[in-house]
Amino acid sequence: MAASVRILGIDPGSRVTGFGVIDVRGRDHFYVASGCIKTPADAPLADRIAVIVRHIGEVVAVYKPQQAAVEQVFVNVNPASTLMLGQARGAALAALVSHKLPVSEYTALQVKQAVVGKGKAAKEQVQHMVVQMLGLSGTPQADAADGLAVALTHALRNHGLASRLNPSGMQVKRGRFQ
């Protein structure tokens, strides 16, 4: 039987950071946990970052993932929002690295393509596919579903057929090894 790998996926946000934990055994994906880390909207930025770092540390301590994946920041129309999102993402990365976890990063487009099959998918489509892929009985909150989608993306890109066919680490682009 294939060894199990536990992956923590993070969807960073300055107000709500979603997380999802899955186990991967061979080609199968199993739900472990998911949730949202909510920061007080009226708190100073340093306090909000501390909440993110502390809670991600708690998730790592409880679920003991072996790998982590984080969604990359997209550039928003509002520079202040983009900066705050980047700081929340930095807090998440710092928390993961401080626990010596290997971290991979994926764009929102890569996550949507991996989970739904198209990069322009709506949040509801991502939630639906997360439920289907993990056999969940209910629909997780949007941010938690995004965290699970990031973990699934990492699993599909690194523990799927392409990685077994290509152990040398070559990249696959447009269906071809490069």
From Swiss-Prot:
InterPro entries: RNaseH-like_sf, RNaseH_sf, X-over_junc_endoDNase_Mg_BS, X-over_junc_endoDNase_RuvC. It is found in: Cytoplasm. One of its GO terms (biological process) is DNA repair. It comes from the Bacteria. The keyword Nuclease applies. Keywords: Cytoplasm, DNA damage, DNA recombination, DNA repair, DNA-binding, Endonuclease, Hydrolase, Magnesium, Metal-binding, Nuclease. NCBIfam families: ruvC. GO terms for molecular function: crossover junction DNA endonuclease activity; DNA binding; magnesium ion binding. Pfam families: RuvC. The keyword DNA-binding applies. Disulfide bonds: none annotated. Mg(2+) 1 binds at D11, D143. It comes from Neisseria meningitidis serogroup C (strain 053442). This is Crossover junction endodeoxyribonuclease RuvC. The RuvA-RuvB-RuvC complex processes Holliday junction (HJ) DNA during genetic recombination and DNA repair. Endonuclease that resolves HJ intermediates. Cleaves cruciform DNA by making single-stranded nicks across the HJ at symmetrical positions within the homologous arms, yielding a 5'-phosphate and a 3'-hydroxyl group; requires a central core of homology in the junction. The consensus cleavage sequence is 5'-(A/T)TT(C/G)-3'. Cleavage occurs on the 3'-side of the TT dinucleotide at the point of strand exchange. Mg(2+) 2 binds at E71. The active site is at D11, E71, D143. Its main location: cytoplasm. Its EC number is 3.1.21.10. Its cofactor is Mg(2+). Homodimer which binds Holliday junction (HJ) DNA. The HJ becomes 2-fold symmetrical on binding to RuvC with unstacked arms; it has a different conformation from HJ DNA in complex with RuvA. In the full resolvosome a probable DNA-RuvA(4)-RuvB(12)-RuvC(2) complex forms which resolves the HJ.
